[in-house]
């Protein structure tokens, strides 16, 4: 599983780097919840804003990963593992955070983060992480939310990340995904 997290790090760092630029010029659009799109494949389904795109979707019996981008630079990551081999949410979030903090960003850095447990919502356990991404002297505070729950025989992890100033535009989309995520009909 560590290899899978490492593979995501490069993609995420590119998003972070671009995100700092976008955040400086406030290019994030609000999540468009009118006529949401629907993902229904690989035993799961969920709705997501019509102005967001799934940019990666890979699935094996051991690992399922979906990477989604907003119109700005916020991201959503879905990962699932067989529940009998999945890590706890605490371990998963710490490992993910450490990998991101240790990864080098050209002309910048990610600050040490703070992780804290948040109340359970929609059946998901949660951990919130706050950190700063700094590039060429511009520091942008970010929030990453880790959520987890068992769906069928899989342990599902959702990761929602956005600049704190973009939370009002992205949170409705994050909530739509969280609240509609379920096992596909007929699975």
Please tell me what each predicted stretch does.
Residues 2-9, 16-71, 81, 111-121, ...:
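N-terminal targeting sequences that direct proteins away from the cytosol to non-cytosolic compartments
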Residues 93-101, 178:
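Generic solvent-exposed, charged/amphipathic alpha-helical segments
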């Amino acid at each position: 599983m560590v290899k899978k997290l490492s593979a995501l790090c490069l993609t995420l760092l590119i998003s972070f780097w671009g995100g700092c630029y976008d955040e400086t010029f406030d290019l994030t659009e609000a999540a468009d919840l009118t006529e949401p799109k629907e993902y229904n494949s690989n035993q799961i389904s969920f709705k997501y804003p019509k102005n967001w795109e799934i940019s990666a979707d890979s699935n094996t019996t051991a690992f399922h990963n979906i990477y989604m981008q907003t119109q700005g630079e916020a991201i959503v990551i879905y990962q699932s593992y067989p529940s009998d081999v999945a890590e706890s949410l605490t371990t998963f979030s710490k490992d993910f955070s450490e990998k991101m903090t240790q990864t080098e960003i050209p002309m910048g850095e990610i600050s040490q983060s703070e992780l804290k447990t948040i109340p359970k919502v929609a059946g998901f356990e949660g951990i919130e992480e706050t950190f700063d991404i700094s590039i060429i002297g511009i520091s942008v505070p970010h929030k990453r939310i880790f959520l987890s729950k068992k769906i069928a025989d899989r342990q599902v992890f959702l990761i929602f990340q956005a600049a704190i100033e973009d939370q009002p535009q992205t949170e409705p989309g994050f909530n739509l995904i969280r609240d509609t995520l379920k096992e596909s009909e007929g699975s």
